[in-house]
Amino acid sequence: MRIGFIGFGEVSSTLSQFFKDKVEVQTCVKGRSEKTKKIAKKLGVKIYKDYKDLVKNSDIVISAVTPFSALDVAKKYGKYVKGIYVDVNNVSPLTKHKILKYIDEEKFVDCAIIGRIKRKFKMICSGKNANKLKILEKFGVPIEVIGSKVGEASTLKMLRSLYTKSLAAILLEVFSVANKLGLIDELLEILEETEGKKFVDLCKSRVVGSFIHSRRRYEEICEIEKFILSHNLKPIMIKCTKNMFKHIEEC
């Protein structure tokens, strides 16, 4: 079996370690950073010179790029898919359905990663042939098929992300004010008393992660906004969240 990754960031490099020495893991690092190239080389991943050949020679293609790039990647390389194309990007069901214009529905799996990829996570999947992805379980990758329609997995992911990203934005503002007042330690102490230590650890993790991945978070929030609008609902909280992450990105 040959598993090809389009994009080789945190998600792909972590997943690739489940398959190491068991299947042929491959990617293309054309246009990628030196850091990404070094990681791919260190992990012993087979490197293709271009994405077209990578896709043509993969039994399972996993697209793990940025939300704003997901559709463009499918447009360029979807026609070369011979096996299964798995989109794990945090994009709205609308974007996943747009991808179907470029990839046969029989070959497409809508997939979302729930949890932290470097800790405890699972991949929820939907699509006509989502069950074919269950083969990855024998390598230790937790797969849960939740439906046969494209959009079901990404809908759940959008709802979860609406909660987590909005919570992160609130925490960023709370910690910003506390820092300005010199009351970070006191705030953490009170939060630990009322919410528990696990919540405090979660707060710290979300705040740090928001700065590290601010650009990607912003793109994900734009997808959440589209998701809300598609259901004829007014995005209120998510607009504030979007402004917060735009502010971080511009700092």
From Swiss-Prot:
Domain of life: Archaea
A Pfam family assignment: DUF1932
InterPro entries: 6-PGluconate_DH-like_C_sf (IPR008927), 6PGD_dom2 (IPR013328), NAD(P)-bd_dom_sf (IPR036291), P5C_Rdtase_cat_N (IPR028939), Pgluconate_DH_NAD-bd_C (IPR015814)
SUPFAM superfamilies: 6-phosphogluconate dehydrogenase C-terminal domain-like, NAD(P)-binding Rossmann-fold domains
Name of the featured protein: Uncharacterized 28.5 kDa protein in 7S RNA 5'region
